[in-house]
């Protein structure tokens, strides 16, 4: 950490669900000599999310006003440099998943462009992220096949195929075995075990992550593997749980999913000071048999490349370590060949994405969507409702905040903006749902998920009052609705829990994903057009966005709620 072997100011001791602060030097050798120990260097990235082009510091599109950082050409160059620099310390490059989704590059070019650049970086092992399922197993299968042809293994110990037809020929082992410097190393892949609830996994489900890691690690130990790495796409908090409850045989966890920036308290290494530090790099967690398991993660979007060097004794126990997340700032050179390789892909993206479809006079915000009503969500919901509106019928619209990925700035709105705003490829489905179920959906939107986030509904045709001072599942104070049989009236009346209402929702939501199980109680459902087409058509119809009626979702406390 911060380049000093064995240093860490703080560890998180995770036992059951209690975090205890302790000195990281506990049980560390007084003698810092590592000459008799076996070094293993882990170079790792996670949650790239299609950031092939350079980005600004916020990991959005880099403009002429910005100082550009990251980008696949810089990431490639830095990984190549680190592999060479630590050649004598047995370097292994790992990719912890979620390479799909996040920019127009993926939305237009899908697995093809992703596989092309992953092949060039060629990790020793990869695991899957939840976003690799964004276009169902059918959209994942050719990606896996392409990587497999290049000898790049994708490993997931807790993947349950359930005879999914699209993945039946895909090779996804639980782990791989490597011989590095005459030492036998096992790498176990694991994916967040609720992925089938938040992604379009088809028949595929995920078994308990802790149990899967424990079981596979024990099997590797029986096969005389003495160093075991867990390559996890489960989140920082879940990785702590894995270390505490399944850490008897594992040695280190390389993580992903939560986009966590880990950075040691006294490190002098370059970084973006605006990046919130969630814990030290590495974070140490004590297992049930009192072993300390290091956990690392390298934030997201190619902004950092992690580098951790571990030192093992003859028994395969970690005795020392050093490393830090390497900041991929503007000073990092871009690999010239990768820059050339980007050119033909960029031409395809620009040809489709640059078409202007409208204009906005206000910023269409995405960052606040999870906690409250947001301008992007309101406009999107209005577009959904408009899709099915006629002279005598105007349905409501409900969209979950997690549907949105990128804001739209003031100015021209391009086809690229439309797709990047909500890039998941849902359809705009018309459903019929009972009032009581709508109430349940609203309650769930302000119940925290596993990452401690709300999922505020973005709505059209409704007014919802949320009192966040109340207990979870008792926060909805009031829901009022417009008369969907009279499109010209803006009058609101109380929701009737016994009545049925017509609502337009993303197909993802209609399927009950993100925990919105009440949606599956719909008594009728009509599959609609692609959501991005609906949004595009609505923007083209209104031409200019300059006035949105807000106040549809009121988030308040106690006496301030009306």
Swiss-Prot record:
Optimum pH is 9.0. (Microbial infection) Interacts with Zika virus envelope protein E and Zika virus-like particles; the interaction does not affect Zika virus replication in human endothelial cells and keratinocytes. Patients with dengue virus or Zika virus infections during the acute or early convalescence phase have higher levels of IgG serum antibodies against the protein. A divalent metal cation 2 binds at residues 98, 130, 233, 257. PANTHER family: 5'-NUCLEOTIDASE-RELATED, APYRASE-LIKE PROTEIN. The N-terminus is blocked. The keyword Hydrolase applies. InterPro entries: 5'-Nucleotdase_C, 5'-Nucleotdase_C_sf, 5'-Nucleotdase_CS, 5_nucleotidase/apyrase, Calcineurin-like_PHP_ApaH, Metallo-depent_PP-like. It catalyses: a ribonucleoside 5'-triphosphate + 2 H2O = a ribonucleoside 5'-phosphate + 2 phosphate + 2 H(+). GO terms for cellular component: extracellular space; plasma membrane. The keyword DNA-binding does not apply. Changing residue 224 to K: In strain: Rockefeller. Its cofactor is a divalent metal cation. A divalent metal cation 1 binds at residues 47, 49, 98. Changing residue 472 to I: In strain: Rockefeller. Glycans are attached at residues 112, 390. This is Apyrase. Facilitates hematophagy by preventing ADP-, collagen- and thrombin-dependent platelet aggregation in the host. Cleaves adenosine triphosphate (ATP) and adenosine diphosphate (ADP) to adenosine monophosphate (AMP) and inorganic phosphate. May reduce probing time by facilitating the speed of locating blood. (Microbial infection) Does not affect Zika virus replication in human endothelial cells and keratinocytes. Pfam families: 5_nucleotid_C, Metallophos. Female saliva (at protein level). Female salivary gland (at protein level). Not detected or low-level expression in female carcasses without salivary glands. Not detected in male tissues. AMP binds at residues 370, 405, 424, 514. Residues 1-24 form the signal peptide. It is found in: Secreted.
